[in-house]
Amino acid sequence: MAAGFKTVEPLEYYRRFLKENCRPDGRELGEFRTTTVNIGSISTADGSALVKLGNTTVICGVKAEFAAPSTDAPDKGYVVPNVDLPPLCSSRFRSGPPGEEAQVASQFIADVIENSQIIQKEDLCISPGKLVWVLYCDLICLDYDGNILDACTFALLAALKNVQLPEVTINEETALAEVNLKKKSYLNIRTHPVATSFAVFDDTLLIVDPTGEEEHLATGTLTIVMDEEGKLCCLHKPGGSGLTGAKLQDCMSRAVTRHKEVKKLMDEVIKSMKPK
Amino acid sequence: MEEETHTDAKIRAENGTGSSPRGPGCSLRHFACEQNLLSRPDGSASFLQGDTSVLAGVYGPAEVKVSKEIFNKATLEVILRPKIGLPGVAEKSRERLIRNTCEAVVLGTLHPRTSITVVLQVVSDAGSLLACCLNAACMALVDAGVPMRALFCGVACALDSDGTLVLDPTSKQEKEARAVLTFALDSVERKLLMSSTKGLYSDTERRYSKS
């Protein structure tokens, strides 16, 4: 009976739940789904992380390669993110060149890296003007159930914390790079940006961490990326219903609490990994 | 509707080159808008903000491909072409922002199973590009006669290192700024429709800039 109603009138079905201040999966309006993170699962990558937000699963693999720096920034390395939404994760996506959703997500992650200064690009320099590191971060979604941006940001952060770069010296005589695989060091992660996504319903109600169906029914979305000092790296609101200042304030405070939760989770995982 | 409407607005008349220093506060560059300048699209507008200029054309409501049609609403499409080169991922991201903003104000339910296409061409870029694109899109939609429940406007502001806010920054001011924030506000309820930010800033600065 409920399943029939849900198919015919999904919005009404949702409204019934929202009136009671809860959601069909039993969560409160401000509650996140269970977040799990697994670090270092891909042995062929220099750093990797798998993040699950409820059903949404994103895996991030980071590969480090050499590159020549550009002439106008001879001591800066590169961080190149790429988000891939394959047909595996949802029936909405077809195989072929990246669709709009994947491109928007890639641009979003690139903006987060750029704005939050998570890695100082100068740290990736090996020899100014000659050799720098380029970190290719590939984020692949394995299961799309809404809130892809939060999962991608978290996966990227966890993977970057897991990256170990070998020591590189330039041989004076041959001018070739010599890689010492035995001596590896972690990246210097300066800030920890954490994304919190909200969906707006009927121009008034805000829910946190929307699932795939909720995103489809929502009239607008909002993503806030915050770092630990409460500074905003990104306020991404791609259109949709208008929001008043007071509502935005509520979102900010929720983002701050979420940041603390995520940071705690990440620290636990990193601590459990360190003695290797 | 055949005559050209030429609207010129000057707020604290200033030269729009950006080389003259503007004090902190609410001074905008000279901005202008011209409608109905293209003959083929149903509506067109050219929006000028200082030296930044964007040309917009709107086709619609028109026929839509069966794969893209929505049974109860109009399908909105935005195409943004940069001044040089082929459109890339950054353009796709901006198209998504502009499209979602337009979808929030356009009364799509009055024209179900049709498509409304907004084509934006960047003519020159001297800062505040996204805001200029939003304004051009809005004026072009008005010129095309697409039913909307409100008008929206795009505003860009730059925060420099000591926290001073500059509205409508030039490319030089954007480069030197710590953060650049672009907002779209609707005309009826003054609510925030779209927000896109670049750089680090604190929450208090955001609230100040929104007011």
Curated annotation (Swiss-Prot), chain A:
GO molecular function: identical protein binding; mRNA 3'-UTR AU-rich region binding
Localization terms from the record: Cytoplasm; Nucleus; Nucleus, Nucleolus
Modified sites of kind N-acetylalanine: A2
GO biological process: exonucleolytic trimming to generate mature 3'-end of 5.8S rRNA from tricistronic rRNA transcript (SSU-rRNA, 5.8S rRNA, LSU-rRNA); nuclear mRNA surveillance; nuclear polyadenylation-dependent rRNA catabolic process; RNA catabolic process; RNA processing; rRNA catabolic process; TRAMP-dependent tRNA surveillance pathway; U1 snRNA 3'-end processing
Cysteine disulfide partners in this protein: none
Keyword presence, tRNA processing: no
GO annotations of cellular component type: chromosome; cytoplasm; cytoplasmic exosome (RNase complex); cytosol; exosome (RNase complex); fibrillar center; intracellular membrane-bounded organelle; nuclear exosome (RNase complex)
A Pfam family it matches: RNase_PH_C
Subunit: Component of the RNA exosome core complex (Exo-9), composed of EXOSC1, EXOSC2, EXOSC3, EXOSC4, EXOSC5, EXOSC6, EXOSC7, EXOSC8 and EXOSC9; within the complex interacts with EXOSC5 and EXOSC6. The catalytically inactive RNA exosome core complex (Exo-9) associates with the catalytic subunit EXOSC10/RRP6. Exo-9 may associate with DIS3 to form the nucleolar exosome complex, or DIS3L to form the cytoplasmic exosome complex. Exo-9 is formed by a hexameric base ring consisting of the heterodimers EXOSC4-EXOSC9, EXOSC5-EXOSC8 and EXOSC6-EXOSC7, and a cap ring consisting of EXOSC1, EXOSC2 and EXOSC3.
Protein name per UniProt: Exosome complex component RRP43
Gene transcribed to yield this protein: EXOSC8
